[in-house]
Amino acid sequence: MTVWLLIGFLLPVAIFAAPPINRLALFPDKSAWCEAKNITQIVGHSGCESKSIQNRACLGQCFSYSVPNTFPQSTESLVHCDSCMPIDSVWDVVTLECPGNEEFPRVDKLVEKILQCSCQACGKELSQEGAMFNVYLNTAEETLSPAETLGHHHHRPPAREEDSPAQSQREGESEE
């Protein structure tokens, strides 16, 4: 009986400890692990030539558990979930060539380059939209609409001689 009282008291204390959890009392010989592993990533886009880049992927085994509940509920639900995910990353622009596409001969793809991984609470993900928006704020090539910052960016070909003088002047002003 005292063992169950002890477990009933210590289990909630252990459960509500600051995440991530590296060891569980029920499995003292097992520990969580998460690391960034080198990979070759293929970046592609329809109608464009793919590129191979060096990147990292998060790989590991993190703890999650759910303790049976009671009704009526006497304590908060005892559920915990950790996942191996990036804790440090940068966004790079990878430019793909699109031969045969005169309107958009190149496409920029944003790629998350993972630097470091660890066990983090499930659902805790970095804001991809905010990170992508910052990448485009720091590039001075073109002004983009918010919709363009959420996926890929098309490069328009340089102005040709047959373009109108007003169009050529506008493009010249945007480069200065």
Curated annotation (Swiss-Prot):
| InterPro entries in the record | Cys_knot_C (IPR006207), Cystine-knot_cytokine (IPR029034), DAN (IPR004133), Neuroblast_suppress_tumour_1 (IPR016728)
Lineage, top-rank taxon, reads: Eukaryota
Q: Does the keyword Transmembrane apply?
A: no
Q: Name one GO cellular component term.
A: extracellular space
Region entry Disordered: which residue ranges?
148-176
Q: Recorded GO terms, molecular function?
A: cytokine activity
Disulphide bridges: 34-84, 48-98, 58-117, 62-119, 81-122
Which residue numbers delimit the CTCK domain? 34-123
Signal sequence extent: 1-17
Keywords (alphabetical) are: Cytokine, Disulfide bond, Secreted, Signal, Tumor suppressor
One Pfam family this sequence matches: DAN
Compartments where found: Secreted
- PANTHER family per the UniProt record, alphabetical: GREMLIN 1, NEUROBLASTOMA SUPPRESSOR OF TUMORIGENICITY 1
Q: Share what the entry says about its subunit structure, partners included.
A: Interacts with bmp2; the interaction is blocked in presence of nog.
Family under the similarity heading:
Belongs to the DAN family.
Per the entry, what this protein does is: May act as a tumor suppressor. Cytokine that has an axial patterning activity. Acts like bone morpho-genetic protein (BMP) antagonist in embryonic explants. Blocks the bmp2 activity.
Identification of the protein by name: Neuroblastoma suppressor of tumorigenicity 1
Organism name: Xenopus tropicalis
Gene symbol here is nbl1
